[in-house]
Amino acid sequence: MNIVKRAVPELLRGMTNATPNIGLIKNKVVSFEAVGQLKKSFYKRQLPKQCLAFDSSLGKDVFLRALQEGRMENYFSLAQQMVTQNEPAFCGLGTLCMILNSLKVDPGRLWKGSWRWYDQYMLDCCRSLSDIEKDGVTLEEFSCLANCNGLRTITKCVKDVSFDEFRKDVISCSTIENKIMAISFCRKVLGQTGDGHFSPVGGFSESDNKILILDVARFKYPCYWVDLKLMYESMFPIDKASGQPRGYVLLEPMHIPLGVLTVGLNKYSWRNVSKHILQQAATVKNADNLAEILLSINQSSIPLIQERSNSSKSGDFEHFKECIRSTKTYHLFLKHTNTNVEYITMAFWAIFSLPMIQKALPKGVLEEIQSLLKEVEISEINTQLTALKKQLDSLTHCCKTDTGCCSSSCCKNT
């Protein structure tokens, strides 16, 4: 062993003497060339003069005035859920996660241990997290994610909104509990580094005409007050990825239980699935043909409907499945398969209740479908189905506006 201990340092000395590009850092052999290639790192950024630090003396004065004006109604619920975005391009996910927990939306799935709670890595219903990690989310994708997770949204692209309307929306969200604004803006207009970014709005001081931005990139900038007019202007610069300006979203709880089931498709796979169904719709003879189409799709791709990962189930869920098994639609599929029949039945009801699909069906088939759709009036089924239909509506809308307002390139620049 002593021979080995003496030999290793000798070997390393020999390597460093023989090869000038090799050295020791913390007892590890490394290439000096590799050291030169290490990424430059940063610790926070200085707020520009256009932004007033929330925790500064003047920032506290603005907060006090806004509080006295009654324009900080959502601040405290948001402050309790303040997060840092998990990845450089997760500003949209960080913002939405913060808002969902602030509005007390039950995700219906486990976070850790026995606790249900929203985490940024749960927000993947519109696009894969690996894609979002590369270039963030668009304004429409943000809305889609919010809808899929139990929020009602109104999305506004700044090119369609006057300053007065924006001001009214800011005041509304600052004075009404359970109504929060998420804003997508260009940092450069505020004198900051970087480009596109999402963050929640924490309040408004009418006397100072300043809006509070609760920046989710806490590793970079603190929370700050900024002039309302400047904030409005920060949404106008054209996003290079889309050729469109940015905007904002007004969010409120939907008051519809999310349930255990979720749509297994993202906006891209739903676009392909709906296109295939529409192409086949005109030639079908009966509901059984439609069932065969759905089964072929379900078997060749990811499931149309699936359980939320780590979902929290109760005895009510088993009763819900028993209700499905009592329907004609369930037995329509049971003739073809005995695997996850309850879930493909829910997919059938959700998809063929969409107006755009119904319009493509022959009259006789549509009448048969409408008869089967009456089975969803069972309350246990209808509750779960309503949430699934909302998700499909959101995915459909997101597909239609895919090249619309703010196809994001969030937070790519330091």
Curated annotation (Swiss-Prot):
Enzyme Commission no? 2.3.2.15
Main function = Required for detoxification of heavy metals such as cadmium and arsenate.
* Catalytic activity of the protein: [Glu(-Cys)](n)-Gly + glutathione + H(+) = [Glu(-Cys)](n+1)-Gly + glycine
What is this protein identified as? Glutathione gamma-glutamylcysteinyltransferase
Under Gene3D superfamilies, the record lists: Phytochelatin synthase, N-terminal domain
For this entry, list what GO says about its biological process: cellular detoxification of cadmium ion; cellular response to cadmium ion; detoxification of copper ion; phytochelatin biosynthetic process
Q: State the organism named in the record.
A: Schizosaccharomyces pombe (strain 972 / ATCC 24843) (Fission yeast)
Q: What PANTHER family has UniProt attached to this entry?
A: GLUTATHIONE GAMMA-GLUTAMYLCYSTEINYLTRANSFERASE
Q: Which SUPFAM superfamilies match?
A: Cysteine proteinases (SSF54001)
Task: Tell me the keywords, alphabetical order.
Answer: Cadmium, Copper, Metal-binding, Transferase, Zinc
Outline the inducing conditions.
Answer: By cadmium, copper and zinc.
Q: Which residues form the Peptidase C83 domain?
A: 37-256
User: One GO molecular function term?
Assistant: glutathione gamma-glutamylcysteinyltransferase activity
May I have one GO cellular component term?
Answer: nucleus
Family that this chain belongs to: Belongs to the phytochelatin synthase family.
